[in-house]
Amino acid sequence: MKILDLIKSRRSIMPNQYNRSLIEDRDINLILDAANWAPSHKKTEPWRYKVLKNKTKDDFGKFLGKKYKESTPNFSNFIHNNLIEKTKKSSVIILICMQRDPNESLPEWEEIASVSMSVQNMWLMATNLK
């Protein structure tokens, strides 16, 4: 696929569109490898990813539901249950994290931008794999 076609065809897939098919480890590794090729100023490579599957993924959904319940004054049972169900519909969840340069040698926004670019690389690789 040509790069411009790939960029134009990238779309977000929402949980109600999931088809419950498993994502192969090989594909997850390709997606994570693409993320590592994002540019980062001063080579800080601030992106960190955590891959959740099976029970860990389901436990994360319960954690989200619990935190929502603890922190929301206008609690909604629908939203609470939806948070938990969305994680169950996913075969894999990749958590996006950022680790600042310990020396803070560049502005935080530059590291956020690097993480954002690595996520874009992930989306493009996932689109290419479909």
Regions found by a protein language model. Name each.
Residues 1-89:
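N-terminal amphipathic, basic helical "cap/leader" segment at the start of enzyme domains
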Residues 11, 98-101:
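Short, histidine-centered active-site or binding-site loop motifs used for metal coordination
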Residues 35, 100-130:
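Small-aliphatic-rich amphipathic alpha-helix that forms the alpha element of a beta-alpha
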Residues 93-97:
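Active-site-flanking beta-strand signature of metal-NTP-handling nucleotidyl enzymes
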